[in-house]
């Protein structure tokens, strides 16, 4: 009988040892106690100490909730800055430029596009020229460069013929002005020799790279160097002409689609409308 009792105790000890080795769940838990209204004794309320996988979704959703409005707000601020910068550089519609110095009132009507602004450049005679030097004159302003292989020379010829026709047949004087977009090669002496081949009345203007870039921005002129190979390169530009009235207001913009006769007729219309 004694050996049987020892065998039973041995089995119990082995079972207890096995249970101790297995132990409880390894998940760390915190135990809170609450009183049960039914049992009248404390019941442990077991909750994980650290959140499991399902609890990580809330912070992610919270971050996404604030990220989208922040991105939209930043984009709106960037667009607003660009608009403010553009308005700051432009001549307001319906008003003359406050920097023109031509005595224009604030109620002066501007028919042309919202472009233009102050500038300081150098003429082919190495003299400083600003927008104030054009006050009281009709000006036909052309942006180009002397190394243009085709469009540039054609535009200068058209400018010369149109201005000459207005002066000889209608006694209307318009000052033709050539503004280079390639100051690196178009020095005052080079421009003087180049423009002399077309018309000695054309005033050539050049300057530093930053000054030319600023004026191009003020007058909304696109230009970009292409096919660069050392000193041999072309400049891609829109080849626009601007008619400026004696108050330094942009009246019209002319593209390459005009011929000399059409250009002179359009110029005469604008000059005559102001003279009436």
Swiss-Prot record:
The chain crosses the membrane at residues 66-82. It is a single-pass membrane protein. This is Protein SCO1 homolog 2, mitochondrial. It is found in: Mitochondrion inner membrane. PANTHER family: ELECTRON TRANSPORT PROTIN SCO1/SENC FAMILY MEMBER (PTHR12151), PROTEIN SCO1 HOMOLOG 2, MITOCHONDRIAL (PTHR12151:SF1). Residues 110-273 form the Thioredoxin domain. Thought to play a role in cellular copper homeostasis, mitochondrial redox signaling or insertion of copper into the active site of COX. Participates in copper and redox homeostasis. Pfam families: SCO1-SenC (PF02630).
